[in-house]
Regions:
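Short, well-ordered secondary-structure micro-motifs
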Residues: 13, 44-45, 70, 123-125, ...
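Metal-dependent phosphoester-hydrolase catalytic domains
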Residues: 139-148, 156-241
Length: 241
């Protein structure tokens, strides 16, 4: 499962956070990637969710839109129902990182990676470079014989050339039953005329040995009839042997 949870933006972030927790609880993911998740005063949303849901958790700051509160830092989070064997941050470009957690599953290792590529419309070169760096990391891990999943907000639709390096080494887990728009103009938190509106920009990607059996969007109206974030969450069912 992956979700850009929109930090503390908006007037009802505390209420949104409760709805985010309930949505995740209902899905019971084995692994959860978060983007635009907050940390402040030594506490993080990722750790709070981990405590509530009984999951291991880790947070890493990364380049994100700035929160109005200067004491709030936004970044990436990973939660897992399995113990995290190793955690590492990988620099993709100035200020932007990928957060990688290695999880031991029997005799095998699964690397669960999350990132949030640059969101600005004119940052095509930056997104391409970041996707290329991610692809190099993925290829290195695959060469070891390990399974790899990348889950995150890539800020580009699937036919965008910026994502070509990453989609060359991983398969898109989205099942093409419907368009899967994660950044929708029907979402009341979306600003009017956003350049990425009505696009699928949030992904779960996996190596070719991991075949999804289902995929879906969640997070539509769990907050008193409103979505808990400006993005919808992506869930994929992927059996891991």
């Amino acid at each position: 499962m992956t979700w850009n949870v929109w930090g503390r933006f908006g007037d009802h972030w505390l209420r949104r956070q409760r709805a985010i927790a309930e949505t995740v609880r209902a899905q019971r993911p084995d692994f959860l990637a978060l983007q635009e998740t907050w940390r402040s005063d030594g506490q993080s949303q990722t750790d709070q969710l981990g405590f509530e849901l009984g999951m291991s958790s880790v947070f890493a700051p990364s380049r994100m839109p700035r929160d109005p509160d200067p004491d709030v830092r936004l970044g990436l989070g990973i939660l897992s129902r399995f113990p995290l064997r190793a955690v590492e941050q990988h620099t993709l470009s100035t200020g932007t990182v990928a957060l990688r957690a290695e999880i031991r599953l029997g005799e095998d290792s699964l690397h669960f990676i999350t990132s949030c590529l640059d969101w600005e419309e004119d940052h095509q070169r930056e997104r391409f470079a970041q996707a290329s760096s991610l692809a190099s990391l993925v290829s290195e891990l695959k060469d070891r014989g390990d399974d790899v999943v990348v889950a995150g907000d890539l800020n580009a639709p699937p036919d965008c050339p910026e994502l070509d390096p990453l989609l060359a080494v991983l398969d898109d887990c989205w099942q093409q039953v419907y368009d899967g728009v994660t950044y929708s103009s029907h979402n009341p938190y979306l600003g009017h005329g956003e350049w990425l509106e009505d696009q699928r920009i949030d992904y779960i990607l996996a190596n070719d040995g991991l075949v999804p059996t289902d995929s879906r969007l969640v997070g539509f109206d769990e907050d008193h009839g409103h979505p808990p974030s400006d993005h919808y969450a992506v869930v994929a069912d992927v059996p891991v042997s």
